[in-house]
Amino acid sequence: MIKMQEHLENRFDFTGQRQRERQREGEKGMPKLEVELKRVVDDSYEIEIGHGLVDQVAADLKHGLAGKVHKFAIITDSNVEPLYARPLEQKLAEEGFQTDVFIFPAGEKSKTRQTKAMLEDAMLEKGYRRDCCILAVGGGVVTDLAGFVAGTYGRGVPFINYATSLLAAADASVGGKTAVDTPLATNLIGLINQPQKVYLDLDTWKTLPEREIYS
């Protein structure tokens, strides 16, 4: 037992700690090790506001917005898919990127753990691993779900928000808040995850229902 204890002390002889460990050993019977993790993280990102930003997204990705990633998962809902997700998919394909569109039924009712799991399984089936980037194309439900998926998929992959609603532009797509709802709580299961960039395409507002404009 004594030899094993000495072996552990020698192996984990971090700077200046061995003597303190021996003192603690005498007091409590076993040494304690302290792990210090100090880092500075810059989560800054750009918000671009304009008209018809699909070409700009493609240009930014070509210039390394998502690093060396060339595989993009476009997450969207059934309403936004034909309007904006498919044109973006086509543009990225023209630029040589590998893209797939992952769709869920539009509406707040889809903001669930079940939808998140469905999206993750669909990405796995398509061969997506850690070397990918997620593009959220849609309103608040889309950006919430896509950002949450990005934060956990492969222990974290980059993502970009392409907001197509006023709510997403003003709140959901910025600030890094991502979450899903459950029968017991709203927006309580989630995480803070900052995007690489946010695009606010004002042209997308032309297709919004009037009730959303005035609300």
Regions found by a protein language model. Give the residues of each.
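ATP/NTP phosphate-donor binding region
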Residues: G29-C133
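Short glycine-/acidic-enriched loop or helix-start segments at secondary-structure transitions
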Residues: Y84-R86, L145-G147, D171, P209
